[in-house]
Amino acid sequence: SDLIPNLFHKLSGQYYYFRDQSKKMFKKEIDNIFEDNDFSSMLNTFFAKRDLEQYAVYNSLAMIDSYFSRLEHILVLALPFSKNNKEYDIKKFIGEFWSKKYSEVFDLNNQDSKRIHDELNLIKEKYRNTFAHGGFEKKGQSFHFHLENYGVVPATMSDYKNSVHFNFTPLNESEFENICLFFDVVDNFFKENLEASWMFCNSGLDLIMDDESLSRLLKKAEDLEVFRNWLDSENERLSNYINAAY
C-alpha cells in the first residue's frame, strides 16, 4: 500500500534551526573600537557588521524556504482529512504548486484563508522566488545603479506595495521579525482550522493510503479526544514494535 512518510518534525527542526540562527545573527553586537577615530578600525567594524547582516539574511532566506517546504508537507498530510472520502489523486496533488495545494485544502472564499494565502504569496514571490530564479525577481526588476561618489548601489525596484526599495540586503531585521510573526499566525490558523490534521502531523505517524487504514484514521478523527488517544496508542504500539525488533 502507498505510504507517505510524515516528515513534519524533521522539517520543523530545519525551519526553527534557521530561524534561531537568523535571530542570533541579527542580535549579535560588534564591538565598536575606534582608536582616535582610526579610519581603518571604523572600516573593519563596518565590514564586520555587514558580514553579520549577510549571514543573518542567508539564514532568513533558508528559513523562508524551509517554512514553505513544511507548509506543503502539512497540506499533503491534511488532504485526506479535508477531502474526507471525496475523490482525489494524492500523487498528482504532491506535484502541484503550493498555492494549488492550499486552495484544495482551504476555501479561498473564506476571508481569513484568502488573506493568509495572499500574504504567503507575497513572501514567496519577494523572497523565495527571487533567489530560486537566479537572484532575479519575477515581478519588477533587480537593478544596480550608480550613485555619484558612492559607486554602485543595489536597489530592488519592484511593484510590491508600489514602492522602490534601496537596500544592501534583500531583507532586514524588522522584515525578518514580521515574517516570523506572520508564520506564527499561519501556524495558529492551521492549528485551529486543521485540528485533526495538525494533531496527525505532530504524531509523527506515517500516512498509510490503503482504503482500510485511511477510513479507520478518518473515523477516529471525527472525535478529537478519541483521535488524540488513538494517536498516542498507535505511537506506543509502534515504539514497542521497534524496541522488540532490536
Residue ranges and their predicted role:
Residues V76-E96, E137-L147:
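Short acidic alpha-helical/loop segments enriched in Asp/Glu that coordinate divalent cations
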Residues K10, Q14-Y17, S69, E119, ...:
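Charged, amphipathic alpha-helical oligomerization/scaffolding segments
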Residues I116-G151:
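Histidine-centered, metal-coordinating catalytic motifs and their short helical/loop contexts
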Residues S1-Y58:
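Charged alpha-helical initiation segments
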Residues E72-L79, N129-G140, K191:
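Charged/polar positions within long, soluble alpha-helices
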